Amino acid sequence: MDYTRGVSVEAAEEEEERRGWDSHSAGTCSSSYTDCSSCCSSDLEPEWLDRVQKNGELFYLELSEGEEEILLPLSPLEPVGVNHVRFNDSEAEILSEERKNVGKNSEPRFRKLAKMLKKKHTSKKGSAGLNGPTCPTSILKQHSSQKAGIIVRYQYRDTCLYVNPDRLPEGEPKEKSNLLQALIGIVHQSSRNSKRIERQGSQEASQRLSNQEKLVVHGFIPGSPAIRCGQILIGDTLVAVNDVEVHVENIERVLSCIPGPTQVKLTFETPVLCSGTALQNQSTQVQTSINDLAALVWGDEHANSQQDLQRMSHIVMYLTLRLDSDTSKEEQEIIYQYPVSEASHKLKSIRGLFLTLSDMLQNVTGAPIISSSLILNDELVHVSYWKENDKLLLISVPAQRFPLLQLKNMTADIVRTLKFMYSTLDRAFCQAENISRLDHFFSLFFQRALRVFSLTGIAGYGSQFYDACSSLLVENLPGVRWLSLPEDIKMEIDTVLSDLEALDFAELSEDFYEMRRLYMIIGTCLFYKGYLLSNHLPKEDLVDVAIYCRQYCLLTLASERIGQLIIWREVYPQYHLKQCGSSATEECTEPGGRYFLLIVGLRHFMLCTLLEAGGCTSKATGHPGPDYIYVDQVKATLLQLEMLDMSIEDRLSSAPNPCLSCADWFLPSTRDKLGNFTNSAVLSKLQTPPKKAPSPVSKRRLFAEAASSLRTRRPSPTRSSGGSDSGTDGAGESVGVVTHSTPDMARKFGRRESLGSGGSDGSGGSGSLLKINKKKYSLPNPFSSGSLRKNLSERETDDIYNTIKLTSGPENTLFHYLYFETLQGVFISPTHKEVEQLGGSIHPQLIKNFHRCCLSIHSVFQQALNQKNSKQSDSVACMDVAGFGPIKEHGVLFECSPENWNDQKKSPPTMSYWVVGRLFMQPQPQELYVCFHDSVTEISVELAFKLSFGMPL
């Protein structure tokens, strides 16, 4: 791996080390971005400034003070610092950097002042800039000063060599650097100053100079490991051996501690000179960064997923169909391949089969190939195809872990993300500088997908299981989870975001500098713990940003309490680029417009901002990095929204509405236990009809309030995997599929208010009632202002107790639901906490089957939409498609029983439930999925679907 850090040359290095704080503060408060002559002590540079790459991109992550202590010990995220060694008579004792610094008077003073200056990137071990990992701390301390003029940029590189101490010649005198030459093969010549001091006989001065003298490579021993590896250059400086800091004085003793034949890691330092105004080198290997990010998000599961990936046969190839017949170069059709491993070698060797299928089937059928399946080494493998012009993108994964429907959606998301990041697939795969970035992208992608599969196979129940089960569906939907909020909170958020988008601040206004602004904000979207709170972006831009955040686990990361997250990169939103190429909008778009994505996260909030350069703003040239004024304004916006933290948490922790039931409550034994509770006086009071029948006008008004309140469900933070091709995952389960269409007038389903009992919240027969004053409370439409929701404590004091539920009758039979609004690009479903409150032993299996079936039903709906939008089919042909109409409905019937049934005398109780999905075609396609008990009547099913009434249908 390569580490980069920009520092300046300054004399008197010895004095710098003794002065401690003075030298460190000088290096902290300055950077190679600006000349020190113009640097002002009162104008500190941002802590992320030295993380910006040459192409202007930035990925900077800093943990919060609490999370770094919890997460870092659980994962290999923290870069391994260079250790120090203290020799005794019999052994060498390794001292960590923290232990070595104990007792230094300058360290506490430095840390205290560093926190005051907010320069935590040099003192906090939890700071991790993901585009440039920090160097070992002891190495950084050697170069902490700054001076105007020449800038020295030190690049750190790790090289692994195999050494064998047993092959050393016996009886050879132990001269200085003998082991360095004999074992490693590096020749180092001492400086003239050290030789002069040795001749003068000053032992103390000689030892002090030896401790400071660097091990510069001056030559090599022929045939040695150093010359065979070809990665060590003359002029490099050896700074560490197996993460132990070395210098002239201790190198021989460190090498003598090598017990036998082994692989040794050598860390080299290479100086690079550049001008004082040059930007920092971007160049760090991001593989460590991506691994660090994955370890931060998933903890110990990260190591397990890496081991599984090494054994799993999977491959990503980008092939060209246009071959040069004049050259006989092997593998000339392969433009990109990941991974390069033995497991993927077999898939790589049959790439000719994939090319033939892609070309032949398109010539025969006239349509491009989408997917294929084959048996390879007694294992079923799915292959997904994506063809553009004369290039073909192939993704192959084992069918046991990735259902085919999931693979198709994953491929579409990958293509959309790469186009959002690089404009075209050719630009992404054909440019050499993007190869390492693509490796990291696909590494994180497969780790994330494999983790979902492993979590769904673990027996148990919890937020991780629900997150994994639901991600199979929600990660394949072109949308993001929505969280409905009370009117006052939503209006306050929208007002703050509108003020930011107006850019009417002093430094951002055109009148301040009498020049054009650098950027214009197209829109923003605000997330909290992965939930979308507010969106001011066009729908296509929102989906692009959401998929990008999903691919890099940013939504999951925001669920943790992060200290600071800053991401900046140029993006290519297809929605705006298509408008630029359209003749209808050509006069409205300035040529040369460029788009940039700025993501800033603080604690649980994450604000994504899409900016445009060009047009009415200044034209961007080169690769501009993030402007600190814009970053500071976004930070200030998030700090302003922090006061809403408690209100949003209360919203997430509130009781489910509409009420959900646990599947275990409907088992025969459980239903008997709940019989007395069902017939209680409280529920009888709830079922009592109103004394005075309302007028038709009041009926419509009353239903509008109830329906809109029922509609606005909180979005679920769920993400999961599985496969909905089969619905028989649990023990003793059988599935039956029922497909039917609904006529046009079925769209006008019964719009009646449903008030009654049931919906007890909890498990094992214990429940709590939602107490809602219907006259004072109704939930708002997620996309418009509505009535203000009251707190649970206030509702408990109301005189009238009503339980809002979607099904009629004495019992609430609704288990789960999901509503996908394609027009807005959002979906709504129960939250993690709402599902966790239900518990149960059968209910987790129900949740898993629900999302597996919804994925299959969603695929059927997409086929219907593709047929409708196909140019070859007109409206008459669309109506002839089986089951196609203004509303399309598919359902799956499950029968389940407890998996661990110990009573051999009695057969396990069974319970049947439906998973039904509906597609509304007009005015915009919308999808609604519900799961309910088999005992519900047809009218109750219609009432369940009024969950979508609050949305525009």
UniProtKB/Swiss-Prot annotation:
GO terms for cellular component: cell projection; cell surface; cytoplasm; cytoskeleton. Residues 756-767 have a biased composition (Gly residues). GO terms for biological process: cilium assembly; establishment of planar polarity; limb development; nervous system development; regulation of smoothened signaling pathway; vesicle-mediated transport. It is found in: Cytoplasm; Cell surface; Cytoplasm, Cytoskeleton, Cilium basal body. Its main location: cytoplasm. Residues 717-728 have a biased composition (Low complexity). Gene3D superfamilies: 2.30.42.10. Keywords: Cell projection, Cilium biogenesis/degradation, Cytoplasm, Cytoskeleton, Developmental protein. Residues 188-275 form the PDZ domain. Residues 1-34, 706-745, 750-769 are annotated as: Disordered. Belongs to the inturned family. PANTHER family: PROTEIN INTURNED (PTHR21082:SF4). Interacts with fuz and wdpcp; fuz, intu and wdpcp probably form the core CPLANE (ciliogenesis and planar polarity effectors) complex. Plays a role in the definition of cell polarity via the planar cell polarity (PCP) cascade. Required for ciliogenesis by controlling the organization of the apical actin cytoskeleton and the positioning of the basal bodies at the apical cell surface, which in turn is essential for the normal orientation of elongating ciliary microtubules. Proposed to function as core component of a functional module called CPLANE (ciliogenesis and planar polarity effectors) involved in recruitment of peripheral IFT-A proteins to basal bodies. This is Protein inturned. It comes from Xenopus tropicalis (Western clawed frog). The gene is intu.
